[in-house]
């Protein structure tokens, strides 16, 4: 891993709900963004759609493994049901790099907190010590990311990692995308963020919203 400024971000499984919005914000902020998908063609199609929104040609679609190999840092945004299989297939390409895992193992139809360990702890154990895993972005509604791309978002990102550099880079990514971010401890703590997703889904359903999220009070950055 490197201390240099990270310039290339791979959004792995980036054709779903969360990935495209993150890709738009990071591309707008000046990062080179790679959209990864199980099939390169799908990644290329979504990348073309995002480039059209931004009126640029800065986002590239690739197969997940190729995107992970080319990137300085990768962000995993696959559906939680594909979490383990995606990690196993990506392990060789992620060696020596940082992976930010956005996974929250929540059934949207019946949201309940998952059992520990956290998804990010599972990822770290599967990938081994040669990959530095951080967890972030679990509590961010996908729908808010595409709005007002040049404006900061009124929400906070909670970042978890056992590796200081991985946490720092995840925070930098969040801030690059217009989000305030906090180091919230190690990977074991990430189970709390997954549980908060269940809470937010329940609240959004009750109050007929799609954009409910979290903001920290009483801590100044």
Language-model regions: role of each:
Residues 2-49:
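NAD(P)+-binding Rossmann beta1-loop-alpha1 motif at the extreme N-terminus of oxidoreductases
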Residues 5-8, 96, 154:
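Phosphate-coordination loops involved in phosphoryl transfer and adenosine-cofactor binding
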Residues 21, 25, 126, 173:
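Rossmann-fold NAD(P)-dependent oxidoreductase module
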Residues 103-143, 147-149:
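Rossmann-fold NAD(P)-binding glycine/threonine-rich loop
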Residues 61, 132-136, 182-184:
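General beta-strand structural signal in soluble alpha/beta enzymes
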Residues 155-221:
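Active-site-lining helix/loop region of Rossmann-like oxidoreductase modules
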Residues 53-54, 58, 63-98, 102-108:
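Rossmann-like NAD(P)-binding element
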């Amino acid at each position: 891993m490197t201390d240099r400024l990270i310039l290339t971000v791979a959004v792995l499984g980036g054709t779903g709900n969360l990935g495209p919005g993150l890709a738009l914000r990071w591309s707008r902020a000046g990062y080179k963004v790679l959209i990864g998908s199980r099939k390169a063609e799908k990644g290329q199609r979504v990348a073309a759609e995002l480039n059209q929104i931004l009126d640029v040609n800065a986002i590239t679609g690739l197969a997940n493994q190729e995107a992970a190999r080319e990137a300085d840092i990768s962000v995993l945004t696959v559906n939680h049901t594909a979490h383990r299989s995606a990690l196993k297939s990506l392990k060789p390409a992620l060696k020596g790099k940082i992976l930010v895992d956005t996974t929250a193992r929540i059934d949207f139809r019946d949201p309940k907190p998952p059992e520990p360990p956290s998804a990010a702890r599972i990822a770290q154990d599967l990938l081994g010590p040669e990959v530095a895993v951080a967890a972030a972005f679990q509590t961010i509604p996908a729908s808010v990311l595409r709005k007002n791309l040049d404006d900061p978002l009124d929400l906070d990102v909670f970042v978890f990692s056992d590796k200081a550099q991985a946490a720092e880079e995840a925070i930098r990514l969040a801030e690059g995308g217009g989000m305030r971010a906090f180091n919230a401890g190690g990977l074991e703590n990430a189970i709390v963020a997954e549980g908060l997703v269940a809470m937010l889904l329940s609240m959004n359903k009750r109050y007929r919203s799609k954009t409910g999220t979290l903001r920290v009070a009483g801590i100044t950055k």
